[in-house]
Amino acid sequence: MIRPRMLRSLLALLLGATTGCTTIQLGAANLIETAEVPRTEVAYGEGPRQRYDVYRALDSIGRPLTTPAPVVIFVHGGSWESGDKRGYAWVGEALAQLGFVAVLPNYGLMPSTRFPEFVDDVARAVAHARARVTEWGGDTSRVVLMGHSAGAHIAALVAYDARYLATQGTTPAILSGFVGLSGAYDFLFDTKLLRRTFAGPPEREHDALPVHFVTPRSLRTLLVMGEDDRTVNPRNTRSLAAALRKAQVPVEEIWVSGTHGVSVGAFARINRGESEIVRRIAAFVRATP
């Protein structure tokens, strides 16, 4: 028989030690004590992947909240070429159980969708969801954009490069903050994947890096990074944090022992109650800017 403490340790090892983060590995920690959380799928465009799932905020005993709740829009990772919102349903459920409305969008993937089109998809989803959050019990003054890995890269571009939301007739000011989990923000185009994903005219490499779009008006930010990440170099987080501080933008950093899955893995049910990462993200989301 595996005792709960032993199981928690095994799953923490699985989540923290993976060099490549998969939804199977991360979702495994949610097979225990699963709970049904209401989910609604919404189309934000006509494309087959232009959909997002909404999870309604719940109180401490699993009932829908009756007061406006903070909103988290979570963008999944997958190296810009894989991943699906349903594979991260456990993140949506975790956020709902923390008392947040969770919105998980899909977006176009490589190779059929190229940069910057997949960022345009997420910007469109953000604007669409932000305009409707009150329908699901959301508080429009507290809408935080969060992403993991490649999803953090895409979300950061939407948060910092105002051109994306401008195409949707709005601005990053509709958001109350950005949370980046193990994200790529300032990288070299030194792999086949990166060169293929961001191929194009010379200015495309500049436009692909969120760090280039930090200004004094950028959103307050919380960055989480595994100290031993081998998938995304930790210098990405250090560089973005330095740029934000130089611009005098409020920024918090959480550095934890572990690799690429340790940041988003904090939302796994087996980890959630003891996770300093989850506690600090929840406090950040609940805060009024």
Label each residue range with its predicted role.
Residues 113-133:
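Alpha/beta-hydrolase active-site loop
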